[in-house]
């Protein structure tokens, strides 16, 4: 069983390329840098970091975190899947664990096709446009939502 405050940090397609792909948009930090900073900023928490290029693997991880138990929330950067994955939307709505959608860039200030999130309506909230700090804000949001709930 996991600690009482394990947070799943779930990253989708292309996030493995952080630091290399469009650094003017996404920054120069790698995903490993972001994960290390997140863990150091919240030493009282346990994190499960997962990144995949596969939509199916994201769905499986969401379902497994619900079935396995011990998770208090999910910070999700679904990458491009944000804009079109009805399967991901359905998976989020099928679990009871709160999911906070995060984005490094402000998706609402980008190209038209990036301004629509099909998962926002089934997430607990959305944090967008604060670079790597979006992940920190996502964790803080989950802590605010779950701190008073019993294990």
UniProtKB/Swiss-Prot annotation:
Pathway(s) the chain acts in: Metabolic intermediate biosynthesis; chorismate biosynthesis; chorismate from D-erythrose 4-phosphate and phosphoenolpyruvate: step 3/7
SUPFAM superfamilies: Type II 3-dehydroquinate dehydratase
Keywords, sorted A to Z: Amino-acid biosynthesis, Aromatic amino acid biosynthesis, Lyase
Catalysed reactions listed for this entry: 3-dehydroquinate = 3-dehydroshikimate + H2O
EC number: 4.2.1.10
Site feature Transition state stabilizer, where: 21
Gene3D superfamilies reported in the protein's UniProt record: Dehydroquinase, class II (3.40.50.9100)
Active-site residues, record numbering mapped to chain: 26 (proton acceptor), 103 (proton donor)
GO molecular function, one term: 3-dehydroquinate dehydratase activity
Superkingdom classification of source: Bacteria
Annotated residues for binding of substrate: 77, 83, 90, 104-105, 114
An annotated GO BP: amino acid biosynthetic process
Assembly: Homododecamer.
Family: Belongs to the type-II 3-dehydroquinase family.
Function: Catalyzes a trans-dehydration via an enolate intermediate.
Protein name per its UniProtKB record: 3-dehydroquinate dehydratase
Organism of provenance: Pelodictyon phaeoclathratiforme (strain DSM 5477 / BU-1)
Annotated gene: aroQ
């Amino acid at each position: 069983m996991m600690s009482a405050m394990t947070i799943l940090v779930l990253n989708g397609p292309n996030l493995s390329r952080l630091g290399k792909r469009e650094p003017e948009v996404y920054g120069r930090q790698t995903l490993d840098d972001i994960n290390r900073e997140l863990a150091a900023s919240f030493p009282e928490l346990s994190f499960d970091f997962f990144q995949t290029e596969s939509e199916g693997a994201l769905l499986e991880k969401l379902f497994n975190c619900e079935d396995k138990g011990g998770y208090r929330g999910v910070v999700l950067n679904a990458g491009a899947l944000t804009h079109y994955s009805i399967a991901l939307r359905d998976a989020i709505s099928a679990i009871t664990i709160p999911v906070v959608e995060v984005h490094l860039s402000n998706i609402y200030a980008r190209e038209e096709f990036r301004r629509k999130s099909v998962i926002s309506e089934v997430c607990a909230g959305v944090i967008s446009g604060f670079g790597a700090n979006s992940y920190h804000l996502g964790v803080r949001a989950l802590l605010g939502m779950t701190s008073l709930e019993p294990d």
